[in-house]
Amino acid sequence: MTFTVDITPKTPTGVIDETKQFTATPSGQTGGGTITYAWSVDNVPQDGAEATFSYVLKGPAGQKTIKVVATNTLSEGGPETAEATTTITVKNKTQTTTLAVTPASPAAGVIGTPVQFTAALASQPDGASATYQWYVDDSQVGGETNSTFSYTPTTSGVKRIKCVAQVTATDYDALSVTSNEVSLTVNKKTMNPQVTLTPPSINVQQDASATFTANVTGAPEEAQITYSWKKDSSPVEGSTNVYTVDTSSVGSQTIEVTATVTAADYNPVTVTKTGNVTVTAKVAPEPEGELPYVHPLPHRSSAYIWCGWWVMDEIQKMTEEGKDWKTDDPDSKYYLHRYTLQKMMKDYPEVDVQESRNGYIIHKTALETGIIYTYP
């Protein structure tokens, strides 16, 4: 019978650093001899001469040939030899690497302000290396391949941040590991505009022209500004930054402007400012020259003056044109006489003005209305 040897197990598989045991089983040997065994892996001799061989699997991964040569040494005659081989498939180890992104609960961010994130591996093999990919809302961020990520948000809302690492290590299968997902709340930017009024307050005579101009500072360059105005807490017309004050009545007013400032990437802001208005009665400008003499009539609490009809005509014409005959048109050649009449009306409870056309006596009531010859 021919001397043979067999190896078990047949075509096994294992993982690097795992120990596999092989057993050589002889048959057909001549009796009375001593059998020894020589083991080799890929033709590299291994220690031990026993029928069992424990082999710690080494990298790199792939197939390795296990060979045993059995020698039966006899007391008489030459030795008998037999050999056998088998193939073992060696696989890489499996990683247990994990990946975490910090901060896991970041503070709210602001559009345009960078937020820093860091990805850290854990339980990775010694000597492992990694490349990184960062994602915002499931879209990969180009050019970001490091373990740190500086994210500058461009829109507001809740952003989902995560990292994927490709981890490689000797004797291990490559691993793609995904981190925890971090939620980052991004707020719009805050602005601090101010509104002022020019002038800060107004003090004018009745019917004089007066305007407030609203000026907004501290707003972004691209900001849109809308205006609204109030007079004594009641809305009035006007949507620009200029407001024309109603000076038709003597008294005081409080004018308030509200400016609403909006800009892309900013929270809108509404700012207000108030200005005080004082409207005083018109004061007739004092003319050059000597005023006509007014005759006091103390027994009647009145005063008398003669006045040319041409002055009366001018008073009535100005009234019909909507002018104030007491103060308007100070360059008129009859202004000296009109000034005298209005002063006389202030100085005396009643007046007796005799016009020259008909000799009529005109009293204060008619002069106040400005209708001398044609009564309404």
From Swiss-Prot:
Q: Which InterPro entries match?
A: HOC (IPR038998), Ig-like_dom (IPR007110), Ig-like_dom_sf (IPR036179), Ig-like_fold (IPR013783), PKD/Chitinase_dom (IPR022409), PKD_dom (IPR000601), PKD_dom_sf (IPR035986)
Sorted keywords for this record are: Capsid protein, Virion
Segments passing through the bilayer: none
What this chain does, per the record? Capsid decoration protein that binds as a monomer at the center of each major capsid protein hexamer once maturation and expension of the capsid has occured. It only has a marginal effect on head stability. Dispensable for the head morphogenesis and phage infection.
Tell me which family the UniProt entry assigns to this protein: Belongs to the Tevenvirinae Hoc family.
Q: Which GO terms describe its cellular component?
A: viral capsid, decoration
Q: Which HAMAP family match?
A: HOC_T4
Q: Where in the cell is it found?
A: Virion
Query: Could you tell me what this protein is called?
Result: Highly immunogenic outer capsid protein
SUPFAM superfamilies, alphabetized: Immunoglobulin, PKD domain
Annotated region Interaction with the major capsid protein: where?
355-359
Predominant location: virion
Q: How does it assemble?
A: Monomer. Interacts with the major capsid protein; one hoc molecule associates with each hexamer facet.
